[in-house]
């Protein structure tokens, strides 16, 4: 008898912040839970979230997500007032928060959201401690990426 594999519909990723990896060097990554309301969970299940313009602030020993947009569904409850850009609390362990506070206080470092995804039934936010890139760093990244693509193309044609 063989065991049945668990069915995983679609991708677990809800939203990605591609600008973060383009504009910053990611030094360290953390996984944070989100404190959400019911209509927000429905929006996430429908994939209607945007974290590209969002940022994270540390206040009073807690971390908060600002600027993330969760578009409410039309079928969401009518008696609940939906605020798409509401500030959401991040759920982190004390040790992780202490590490984030120490990292964010260093000169030139910030905390950016990287991706929003499902982990089992829970919505998780991957956040990173990041240092800003200069313009020449971005150009170097583009050069290496283009060279990698050209190299793959050359190798593909060389095998023919």
From Swiss-Prot:
| Function noted in UniProt | Required for rescue of stalled ribosomes mediated by trans-translation. Binds to transfer-messenger RNA (tmRNA), required for stable association of tmRNA with ribosomes. tmRNA and SmpB together mimic tRNA shape, replacing the anticodon stem-loop with SmpB. tmRNA is encoded by the ssrA gene; the 2 termini fold to resemble tRNA(Ala) and it encodes a 'tag peptide', a short internal open reading frame. During trans-translation Ala-aminoacylated tmRNA acts like a tRNA, entering the A-site of stalled ribosomes, displacing the stalled mRNA.
A Pfam family recorded for this sequence: SmpB
User: Family assignment?
Assistant: Belongs to the SmpB family.
Can you cite an annotated GO cellular component? cytosol
> Where is it mostly found?
cytoplasm
The UniProt regions of compositional bias labelled Basic and acidic residues, in chain numbering, are 137-153
Supply the PANTHER family for this chain: SSRA-BINDING PROTEIN (PTHR30308:SF2), TMRNA-BINDING COMPONENT OF TRANS-TRANSLATION TAGGING COMPLEX (PTHR30308)
Please report the organism this UniProt entry assigns to the protein.
Edwardsiella ictaluri (strain 93-146)
Query: What is the protein name stated in its UniProt record?
Result: SsrA-binding protein
Report residue spans for region: Disordered.
Answer: 137-160
Check the record and name the Gene3D superfamilies matching this protein: 2.40.280.10
Query: Biological process GO terms, please?
Result: trans-translation
Its subcellular locations are: Cytoplasm
UniProt keyword terms in alphabetical order: Cytoplasm, RNA-binding
GO MF annotations, alphabetized: RNA binding
